[in-house]
Amino acid sequence: MAPIPGVMPIGNYVSLYVMLPLGVVNADNVFPDKEKVEDELKQVKAGGCDGVMVDVWWGIIEAKGPKQYDWSAYRELFQLVKKCGLKIQAIMSFHQCGGNVGDAVFIPIPQWILQIGDKNPDIFYTNRAGNRNQEYLSLGVDNQRLFQGRTALEMYRDFMESFRDNMADFLKAGDIVDIEVGCGAAGELRYPSYPETQGWVFPGIGEFQCYDKYMVADWKEAVKQAGNADWEMPGKGAGTYNDTPDKTEFFRPNGTYKTDMGKFFLTWYSNKLIIHGDQVLEEANKVFVGLRVNIAAKVSGIHWWYNHVSHAAELTAGFYNVAGRDGYRPIARMLARHHATLNFTCLEMRDSEQPAEAKSAPQELVQQVLSSGWKEYIDVAGENALPRYDATAYNQMLLNVRPNGVNLNGPPKLKMSGLTYLRLSDDLLQTDNFELFKKFVKKMHADLDPSPNAISPAVLERSNSAITIDELMEATKGSRPFPWYDVTDMPVDGSNPFD
């Protein structure tokens, strides 16, 4: 259909969701504040938002024992969201709540899993010093039958199947539009390399998390197969959580990370993470195939030390991203196999807001990661990393959702599929803050009225054939990101291009 002169094409519309509070369903599996939440949801709806995102906690739903799922509180919540005319993005939260930036609630993974970990702590990610991290199960146990007859992947699958079956009415009605599948700490596809619970503070480089016995055994087999059985994982030369790159043998310029052994380790470490994501999303695709719903995975925004030659903080988190090697496009290629969306974070951040000593570059990181997704022809969505209520942050997010601006003749070539704002709170709903937020929502929608027709997921198709390591390696070849405008063409305090 030809564009109508003077009318903004609907293809410029970017859906806007708001994250619900972490404990909206509490640790006792109760939805306690129905009246308060209903009032807040009505304000969100009146503000023009399209929907909400909510963590669906494994530690709440399967708390009583294996396959003993209780969805009653979440059904109450979803019914209320539907009543208020909002769509739902549901996170399959297989991680612990608590221990990360912004966590004001504590919800552990199921207690019966933790009890297995008491006897076998190697089910958890482990650093070189032997410290265990109970936020999420090690990818080393993905296929280990250690959980009362099930593997970790089977537990994730069974949880998602139960969600699908118990929320079938919401899925069929189109109320649930996105399923974000947790693949690591904080629900992100990453290693828990920077845990505040173990003393990490920004901008520490973090530590590698591959010293549980299952990952160590995998490493030993990998180096043996490569004919280098004497190669070892990084030792103390990789430093500790709060080191800077230049203080370490591994990450300093021309450090161990550039040697053959260092490159082999980083390739192995990052590939294990991608394969983990691939296996989890394979299960998710099988569960939700044939439904009108998007599946997604979130990638962490490790923006500190991006401007250091070694990208140390990215490397410890599992993103092998250095000059001439793209650490994110292989992830996008893996997601493309499953018809999944790449969800990224730190969209609100500007380089100038970061401390110089952190060599942080969130703007360049966002540009690289979003470009990687678009080059693999997948949908890209995102969120802010920290709560912000100011025009500067909103305008940065508006720039990133349409990096080359609106297109008056149809959909822009570069456009994010949606943005989720972190987070619904009393601060957001404070009068002045919410008035500016409503302007932000309007600009996300390209000055169009809220449109349910803009949110219509296609039927999820079955995953494509398995991806080979060679195909992943081909995706690491560095290429320039797409160009970005310097500023958004639709600022919160400005007009639209038709005015």
Swiss-Prot record:
EC number(s) from the headed UniProt entry: 3.2.1.2
Enzyme class: hydrolase
Top-level taxon: Eukaryota
Homology family: Belongs to the glycosyl hydrolase 14 family.
GO molecular function, one term: beta-amylase activity
Gene Ontology BP terms: polysaccharide catabolic process
Record field: temperature dependence: Optimum temperature is 50-55 degrees Celsius.
Entry's pH dependence statement: Optimum pH is 5-6.
Keywords: Carbohydrate metabolism, Glycosidase, Hydrolase, Polysaccharide degradation
Catalytic activity, reaction form: Hydrolysis of (1->4)-alpha-D-glucosidic linkages in polysaccharides so as to remove successive maltose units from the non-reducing ends of the chains
Subunit structure: Homotetramer.
Binding, substrate: 55, 95, 103, 298, 303, 345, 384-385, 423
Protein name per its UniProtKB record: Beta-amylase
Active site (UniProt): 188, 383
